[in-house]
């Protein structure tokens, strides 16, 4: 059996403790991986797989990544579902030798990298939160706790098992913590649905008594009463989250703000299907482009962008909150010059939250200190812009949070250079004049370098070799270098008595002298001394910043609020949006409403302007349901979605794309539009539709807004009609909510005559010579046909198929009018015989074309030409 080397024995011991993670084992300038880790990482990273030695008679697979580029490789591995344990050298090889000639460099895991515990800019999306979530059940209660360790946000709320899916859809976390069996297995399908990595923890992590102690230690308090009254399940979820952070960060806990308790009735409830169907933050293809967020996001700071996405996912139901946000927008619109100045200052503001988090976890550097300095400088300028003005509450509060950092800003301004390096070990980030000991060490170091230049000139004259150079590398230090031709006389007396041979390369020979070695020692000592002073000063400055971390987090929140208010005001002004009226009623009256994403796309493509439409779903009591009929491609789905989006925008405190909008607060937003299957879970398109419809009928209350599109279309005609009919009746009688119901089942329109609160709407079209023109106007009334054949023709079906479809449709409609049996008709139709190809249809000519052919321009007077133009316009209608 092959003897295991001391280094490999150390590796195997560490790996055993982190069996479920890839081990990044530090060896000099590389992180090396061995055995199965190497095989998996090489495939995931597309890097070379090599071997190093043998273990139990087999070659040991090995691969590695350079330390300086490790972040990029880490990101790839995390995105592919791996967890990575980072094992660093805790001492230098020289220090290890002091313990014995055969001692292995001491190593230890300093961090476990998982999807929910990322902090580096390179591993995160600057404009999105990265939430770690813990779910706990204690007796009959359950709770959800979530934190973003890169910003310090920390929240908790009670949640029932049925409400877990909508909340996960709202938060879109990167990792979900649950207790091991049986909850882990029970929630695995849900986590898979949301594509969230699921991490099991032992029961001890979820112990609520231990959790309370953990939280008190974290916040250095004797009791949590100052933060609120927490249920046992809430304590359990928070405690598990803190315990996991302690495990992954190896005892270096992040700066978490005091936990904010949230209530279910605080925000509009939106389930996962509705978020997906409305494309709030991601399009159906999973991209940011094409989503509502991509169209309305005009924020200029990462913090403002994160706040916007958070608001979009959690529209408020609190009228005071909504009105405060709208008042802030009113102010920014009325004071457009001030708002523009604020946005200009905000553009220069770094990400304070994430800089603070890295400093707290000891992963920061001088640039994070500079980010705090620059951010505080901009905060001071922003507060000065608003000084002396009568401000609305939200903006006044945000500006007040930016003051009181004069001492810290002065310290950082004095201590740091303008553009510091990324890492403290690089040195050169402390400004001259800040520390006298540092200035002295630097002067000695720099003077020594000047002496080197003079020494090179002296040696060139002494040897008579004009091309002689003094150079430096990390192996030899300073050395004298000359060509092999010139080196001959330096290798022989008398010069050999002064110049000591060090190394010969292919083209060069290198020497040193006693004088040069002594000078190098002085320079090296001075340089090392200067770097040690800088590192000490870095620790001191970091400590000064972290002492004010809580206030800095509040200031960062204030900057984000200002960014979001000015961004939404800029959007409203540029897009001609209106201020919505939001109250506790069940009103829903929108005039000239538009779909923000579709309107944006039409404008970008240079197409026709968006056709605005009204929507009135107001109801004092009982249901208010609008039954929408009309052909495909007419804009029914767009109309449904735009009214849902207008509601959502109003309740995040934004202006809305309409001429006017009066909206009674919506408690729940449900959307059943579009068609998709779920092959992984064995669900057909129709089954998915029914599951989503069931959720709506079982959950919607009388303040909900429901939009339903084509219920029942995925099955046989009478089955589908029956389901749609019963669904509409249930919405009317039981849910008693506000709803838009689009359908091709024209039989449903008869319900408007029998059910109070149900009215018919239709999307107008115009027929001309067998073709259909979509007007995209929603009017009162019901459609009597769907124009499916015309839409098929527009889609490019072969002319023979379109013609055959017209024949079949005409005969089916005739049979229905005459009361004939459908089967007899079908038997008469040669449906399974191929129709012969039809000749291409003759091009249609309009009356205007005929008139144009009869015109002789040279024979017309100007007056006759003008009259003819009016006639042509009339004929073209």
Swiss-Prot record:
GO function terms (MF aspect): ATP binding; ATP-dependent DNA damage sensor activity; damaged DNA binding; mismatched DNA binding
Binding-site positions, ATP: 630-637
Keyword presence, DNA damage: yes
SUPFAM superfamilies cross-referenced by the UniProt entry: DNA repair protein MutS, domain I, DNA repair protein MutS, domain II, DNA repair protein MutS, domain III, P-loop containing nucleoside triphosphate hydrolases
Record InterPro entries: DNA_mismatch_repair_MutS (IPR005748), DNA_mismatch_repair_MutS-lik_N (IPR007695), DNA_mismatch_repair_MutS/MSH (IPR017261), DNA_mismatch_repair_MutS_C (IPR000432), DNA_mismatch_repair_MutS_clamp (IPR007861), DNA_mismatch_repair_MutS_core (IPR007696), DNA_mismatch_repair_MutS_N (IPR016151), DNA_mismatch_repair_MutS_sf (IPR036187)
Lineage top rank: taxon: Bacteria
GO biological process entries: mismatch repair
Cited Pfam families: MutS_I, MutS_II, MutS_III, MutS_IV, MutS_V
Transmembrane segments: none
Keywords annotated in UniProt: ATP-binding, DNA damage, DNA repair, DNA-binding, Nucleotide-binding
Signal peptide, first to last residue: none
A cellular component annotation (GO) from this entry: cytosol
The family this protein is said to belong to: Belongs to the DNA mismatch repair MutS family.
Function: This protein is involved in the repair of mismatches in DNA. It is possible that it carries out the mismatch recognition step. This protein has a weak ATPase activity.
HAMAP family registered for this protein in UniProt: MutS
NCBIfam families: mutS1 (TIGR01070), PRK05399.1 (NF003810)
This protein's name: DNA mismatch repair protein MutS
Organism whose genome encodes this protein: Ruegeria pomeroyi (strain ATCC 700808 / DSM 15171 / DSS-3)
């Amino acid at each position: 059996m092959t003897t295991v080397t001391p280094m490999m024995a150390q590796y195997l011991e560490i790996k055993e403790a982190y069996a479920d993670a890839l081990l990044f084992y530090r060896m000099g300038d590389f992180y090396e991986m061995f055995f199965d880790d190497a095989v998996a990482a090489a495939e995931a990273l597309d890097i070379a797989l090599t071997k190093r030695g043998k273990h139990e008679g087999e070659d040991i697979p090995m691969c590695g990544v350079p330390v300086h580029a490790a972040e990029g490789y880490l990101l790839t591995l995390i995105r592919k579902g791996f967890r990575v344990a980072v094992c660093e050298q805790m001492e230098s090889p020289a220090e290890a030798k002091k313990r014995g000639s055969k001692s292995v460099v001491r190593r230890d895991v300093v961090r476990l990298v998982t999807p929910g515990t990322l902090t580096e800019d390179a591993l995160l999306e600057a404009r999105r939160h990265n939430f770690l979530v813990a779910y706990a059940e204690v007796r009959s209660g359950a709770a959800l706790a979530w934190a973003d360790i890169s910003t310090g946000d920390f929240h908790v709320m009670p949640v029932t098992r049925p409400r877990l899916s909508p909340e996960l859809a709202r938060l879109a976390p990167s990792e979900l913590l649950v207790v091991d069996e049986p909850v882990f297995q029970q929630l695995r399908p849900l986590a898979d649905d949301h594509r969230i990595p699921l991490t099991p923890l032992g029961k001890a992590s979820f112990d609520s008594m231990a959790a309370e102690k953990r939280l008190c230690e974290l916040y250095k308090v004797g009791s949590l009463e100052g933060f609120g009254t927490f249920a046992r399940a809430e304590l359990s979820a928070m405690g598990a989250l803190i315990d996991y952070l302690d495990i992954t960060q190896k005892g270096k806990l992040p700066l978490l703000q005091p936990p904010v308790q949230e209530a279910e009735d605080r925000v509009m409830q939106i389930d996962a299907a509705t978020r997906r169907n409305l494309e709030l933050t991601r399009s159906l293809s999973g991209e940011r482009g094409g989503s509502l967020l991509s169209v309305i996001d005009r924020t200029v700071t990462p913090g403002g962008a994160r706040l916007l996405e958070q608001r979009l996912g959690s529209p408020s139901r609190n009228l005071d909150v909504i009105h405060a946000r709208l008042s802030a927008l009113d102010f920014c619109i009325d004071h457009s010059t001030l708002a523009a100045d604020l946005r200009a200052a905000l553009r220069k503001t770094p990400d304070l939250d994430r800089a603070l988090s890295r400093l707290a976890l000891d992963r920061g550097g001088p640039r994070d200190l500079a980010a705090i300095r620059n951010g505080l400088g901009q905060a001071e300028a922003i507060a000065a812009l608003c000084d002396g003005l009568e401000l609305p509450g939200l903006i006044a509060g945000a500006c007040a949070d930016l003051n009181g950092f004069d001492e810290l800003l002065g310290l950082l301004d004095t201590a740091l250079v303008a553009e510091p390096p990324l890492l403290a070990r690089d040195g050169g980030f402390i400004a001259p004049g800040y520390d006298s000991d540092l200035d002295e060490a630097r002067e000695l170091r720099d003077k020594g370098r000047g002496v080197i230049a003079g020494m090179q000139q002296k040696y060139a004259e002494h040897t008579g070799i004009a091309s002689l150079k003094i150079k430096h590398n990390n192996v030899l230090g300073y050395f004298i270098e000359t060509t092999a031709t010139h080196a001959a006389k330096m290798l022989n007396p008398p010069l050999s008595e002064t110049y000591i041979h060090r190394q010969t390369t292919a083209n060069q020979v290198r020497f040193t002298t006693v004088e040069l070695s002594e000078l190098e020692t002085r320079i090296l000592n001075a340089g090392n001394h200067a770097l040690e002073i800088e590192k000490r000063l870095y620790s001191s400055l970091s400590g000064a910043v972290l002492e004010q971390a809580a206030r800095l987090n509040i200031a960062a929140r204030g900057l984000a609020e200002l960014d979001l208010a000015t961004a939404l005001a800029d959007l409203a002004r540029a897009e001609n949006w209106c201020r919505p009226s939001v109250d506790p009623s069940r009103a829903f009256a929108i005039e000239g409403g538009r779909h923000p994403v579709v309107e944006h796309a039409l404008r970008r493509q240079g197409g026709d302007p968006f056709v605005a439409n009204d929507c009135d779903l107001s109801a004092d009591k009982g249901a208010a349901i609008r039954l929408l009929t009309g052909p495909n491609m007419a804009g029914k789905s767009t109309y449904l979605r735009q009214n849902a989006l207008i509601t959502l925008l109003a309740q995040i405190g934004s202006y809305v794309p309409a001429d006017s909008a009066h909206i009674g607060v919506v408690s729940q937003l449900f959307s059943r539009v579009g068609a998709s299957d779920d092959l992984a879970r064995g669900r057909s398109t129709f089954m998915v539709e029914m599951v989503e419809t069931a959720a709506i009928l079982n959950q919607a209350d009388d303040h909900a807004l429901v939009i339903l599109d084509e219920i029942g279309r995925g099955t046989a005609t009478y089955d589908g009609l029956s389901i749609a009919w019963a669904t509409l009746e249930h919405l009317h009688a039981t849910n008693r909510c506000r709803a838009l119901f689009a359908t091709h089942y024209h039989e449903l329109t008869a319900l408007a005559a029998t059910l109070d609160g149900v009215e018919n709407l239709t999307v107008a079209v115009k027929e001309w010579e067998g073709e259909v023109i979509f007007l995209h106007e929603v009017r009162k009334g019901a459609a009597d046909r769907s124009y499916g054949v015309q839409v098929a023709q527009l889609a490019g079906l072969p002319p023979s198929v379109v013609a055959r479809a017209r024949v079949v449709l005409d005969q089916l409609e005739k049979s229905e009018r005459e009361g004939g049996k459908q089967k007899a008709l079908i038997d008469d139709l040669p449906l399974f015989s191929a129709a012969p190809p039809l000749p291409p249809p003759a091009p249609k000519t309009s009356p205007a074309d005929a008139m144009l052919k009869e015109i002789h321009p040279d024979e017309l007077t100007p007056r006759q030409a003008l009259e003819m133009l009016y006639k042509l316009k009339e004929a073209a209608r």
